[in-house]
Each structure stands twice: as C-alpha cells, then as structure tokens.
C-alpha cells in the first residue's frame, strides 16, 4: 500500500479529497487527514508517507513551507499541491521544490485526479523496487568481502543516495558478519 497524507485547512475540501476516490481499493492507505499543516509535518515525521497531497495557501505553515520542510527532512516523498489560486509565483516555487504536480481545485474531478495519483503510485512502486535492489546489492557486496570497518563506512558513505539513516549504516558495519541482517532493511 502507498501511504498518503492529506492536508487542507478547508474542512469541506479535505472531506472531498478524502472521499473523491476509494483510496484502499486503488492501493493507497490514508495515514493522515488533517486541516493543520503543523500536525501534517508531525504525521510526516512519524509515518513517512509516500505521497503528500496538500493545499498551498493555508494559515501558519503554508503548503510551500510544508513541502520545503518535507524536502529538508529527507526521503523521497512525492508531493502534489492543490490550490484555488492560479498564482504563477506559487507554481514557480512548487517547481523549485520538486513538487510532482500542481492542480487547481476548480479543475479537480475524480477521473483526472485518479489518473494523476495512479501515475504517481507507479512511480513510487518503481522507486521502491529500485531502492530495494540497490540496498540489497550494496549489502550483499559488503557481506561477501572480508574488509575492514573503515572500508565498510567508506562504501556506505559513498552510497548515501540509497537513503538509509546513519544509524542503520553503523548497525550494518557492526553486524557485518551476519549476512542476513540486510533483510531487516527491506522497505
């Protein structure tokens, strides 16, 4: 299941998003639905959703700031912005943040929305498969060789793009004589 977080300060818009499609039927799990962007960030940090769908203009932490905070926190979370505004400045900022899509709320309808998120779902699944393959290949290489801890650390640091947190790197290095340890890191 692809984990999704929905964020919109307008309760009716949020309810519409929550019910626009049958999320579970299409392979999505709603891990959070909130009108509060600060709460959304806390949910993000705890549950690491694969996809965040957020309004852009919200009081307090707006969608752009939320997207920026998510990018700074790390990970490969996909972000889709919704907005009632055709403001080109928002679009430019969203592009700078690497946002996956920007949809005007006035254009939001079930079939088009479903096509967009199913396309994102395919991308997420491909990324997870590639990441899993990369992690497995690197760890198998590490465990096949009889090398020093320092070399292990160098290899792991060079392969930082696989997205493991540093604490896992050190677990791997300290447990390098246990070939099946990498099974714990499958995503």
Q: Which functions belong to the PLM regions below?
A:
Residues 4, 30-31, 79:
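Hydrophobic/aromatic residues located in beta-strands of well-ordered beta-sheets
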Residues 23-27, 73-75:
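Short helix-capping segments at alpha-helix termini
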Residues 25-30, 47:
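A generic structural motif
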Residues 41-132:
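CheY-like receiver
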Residues 92-95, 99-187:
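Interdomain helical linkers/hinges and coiled-coil/dimerization scaffolds
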């Amino acid at each position: 299941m692809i984990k999704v977080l929905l964020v919109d300060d307008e309760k009716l818009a949020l309810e519409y998003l929550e019910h626009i499609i049958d999320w579970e039927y299409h392979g999505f799990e709603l891990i959070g639905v909130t009108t509060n962007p600060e709460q959304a960030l806390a949910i993000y940090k705890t549950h690491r959703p694969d996809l965040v769908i957020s309004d852009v203009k919200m009081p307090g932490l707006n969608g752009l700031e939320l997207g920026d905070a998510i990018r700074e926190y790390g990970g490969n979370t996909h972000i889709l912005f919704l907005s009632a505004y055709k403001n080109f400045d928002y679009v430019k900022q969203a592009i700078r943040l690497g946002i996956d899509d920007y949809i005007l709320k006035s254009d939001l309808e079930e079939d088009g929305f479903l096509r967009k998120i199913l396309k994102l779902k395919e991308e997420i699944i491909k990324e997870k498969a590639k990441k899993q393959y990369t992690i497995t290949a690197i760890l198998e290489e590490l465990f096949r060789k009889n090398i020093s801890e320092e070399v292990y650390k160098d290899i792991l640091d060079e392969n930082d793009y696989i997205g493991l947190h540093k604490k896992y790197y050190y677990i791997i290095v300290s447990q390098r004589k246990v070939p099946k340890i990498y099974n714990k890191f499958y995503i």
